[in-house]
Amino acid sequence: MQSVIADLKQQEIKPLLRFITCGSVDDGKSTLIGHLLYDSQCLAEDQLADLMVDSQRYGTQGEHIDYALLLDGLAAEREQGITIDVAYRYFDTEKRKFIVADCPGHAQYTRNMATGASTADAAVVLVDARKGLLTQTRRHSYIVALLGIRHVVLAVNKMDLVGYDQETFEAIASDYLALAAKLGINQVQCIPLSALEGDNLSKRSARMPWYVGPSLLEYLEALEPADVDLAAAMCLPVQWVNRPDSQFRGFTGTLAAGRVRPGDAVVVLPSGCVSRVVRVFNGDTEVHEAVAGQAVTLTLADEIDISRGDVIAALDDPPEVADQVTAYVLWMDDTALLPGRRYWLKLGARMVAASVSDIKHRVDVNTQEQRVAQRLQLNEVGYCQLSLDAPVAFVPYARNRVLGSFILIDRHSNATVGAGTLDSGVHRASNVHWQPLDIDHVARARIKGQTPKVLWFTGLSGAGKSAIANIVDKRLHALGYHTFILDGDNVRHGLNRDLSFTVEDRVENIRRVAEVARLMVDAGLVVLVSFISPFRDERQLARERFAANEFVEVFVDVPLAVAEARDVKGLYAKARAGLITDFTGIDSPYEPPPHPELHLRADQGTPEQLASQVLSFLGVEAN
């Protein structure tokens, strides 16, 4: 028992290094890690036995051990001989503990690679000695640089297949060093090796006497990760408000930067409230000081409203606070990122609604050239400006990986669709304020004697939206209501005349109309909006511009065949003939509302009858 305790204590004091392996398909990443695990004697007897069996069943090395099978855990991976998901493995040597992430090489799994790289101290970039630098090598190296990994190993693998040729290695190393310099990666160690044969893997190989550097494991054991910057200003993202009883109120989280002591002056962001640290706890133990990386609980001298997601920071050097920011975004979803579309942005423990207001450029990760883009597709990287519904406290990613990184979440599926690194705040965001006005929307509604709201008619072209809205408008006007119609066709003659019918411009079309409708509701009007508005996200964006009782979604539902048969304007015929592109229902989707306030079956009634249903819903007696 004493020996076990001694071993555990020894493990506690060993330094930990997190690293990833990345590169192109079949460069040997899984084989390299599997061989390291084998050499480090970290495998149990049953794992070794399973490896022998699996090598015969799935292996690609004949009668020899297939080390890659230690990493390729998914059935699909073993059957295809590729890595799909990020595989994390732990091993240790006498000098150090390691957590290694084996990242997939296929281009469609670049998002998985970015996940593995987000917490890494170092990256091992594998290159097949027979092929040299490939597209995916450049892509992964760009992401390594983007995510701030400062230590990179170029592992030129499969040297056994080129006869351990020195010139081959040096040519590849020269090409990669030029790429690394272009990407701003300054610390690169180039190592020739054979993951299958074990050359220069755990120890130096006699087969390459011309190489005088360390083996891969020797380099990783000696590598010193970037130290935590204790001189940086203190920042604590609050993860939890700890209130076990009425006598204690603490704020818990992991210090993202600097150090904290009792008596330190702090500011709470984004509120800007100022206080002083009274007590500092590390776990249940009260301490005189805590440093970055430690989980702490702070108590403050003042009763301040602090919630999960707020940041407690040093008063003399706080993080920036902004509701508009610029950032590099790696898109990770099959559905493209579109400017104006709404997502959840999660920065630490803080969650706010956000949209990309502008894609300034897309980065060609193969050449690092900047290209014009109106959307980001899966695995693409763009430099974007984001607009947030509420201000957030952040530090640029180049200075702090914790307070400078975020993810984007789909508001319907809750899937992570993007990851980003913050660059800066947009300064004008903090200089624009609401001008207080004496006459508000309540006063304007009162003088008109009505409850303002927006009726948002949505449906396919030819469903009858405009006809129904027009009848409702006439009847409300006859009853003395103050109304206005915003019709999709009419608005495109003026306000939105610069917009086309691409997905991107459709999103902007609805954003503008929603803002105009909001102004009209503030003026006390009943606004009838008649737009196809095919995308659920944009209709949700419009809904969020209004109070809960101000927005009525009216789904004018009609089968596509019925709408196409009507075809009053001849648009369906032109779309079928290819004369019109991006036409809703033909080559552009319509996403039906899942829960509209009012569902009209336009094929089961006349426009007059359907208009009566709208008025009945509103509780209005028509003439």
Swiss-Prot record:
Residues 1-450 are annotated as: Sulfate adenylyltransferase. Residues 23-30 are annotated as: G1. Its EC number is 2.7.7.4, 2.7.1.25. The active site is at residue 533. Residues 451-623 are annotated as: Adenylyl-sulfate kinase. InterPro entries: APS_kinase, CysN_GTP-bd, CysN_II, CysN_NoDQ_III, G_TR_CS, GTP-eEF1A_C, P-loop_NTPase, SO4_adenylTrfase_lsu. ATP binds at residues 459-466. GO terms for biological process: hydrogen sulfide biosynthetic process; sulfate assimilation. Pfam families: APS_kinase (PF01583), GTP-eEF1A_C (PF22594), GTP_EFTU (PF00009). It catalyses: sulfate + ATP + H(+) = adenosine 5'-phosphosulfate + diphosphate; adenosine 5'-phosphosulfate + ATP = 3'-phosphoadenylyl sulfate + ADP + H(+). Keywords: ATP-binding, GTP-binding, Kinase, Multifunctional enzyme, Nucleotide-binding, Nucleotidyltransferase, Transferase. In the C-terminal section; belongs to the APS kinase family. Heterodimer composed of CysD, the smaller subunit, and CysNC. NCBIfam families: apsK (TIGR00455), CysN (TIGR02034), PRK03846.1 (NF003013), PRK05124.1 (NF003478), PRK05506.1 (NF004035). This is Bifunctional enzyme CysN/CysC. It comes from Xylella fastidiosa (strain 9a5c).
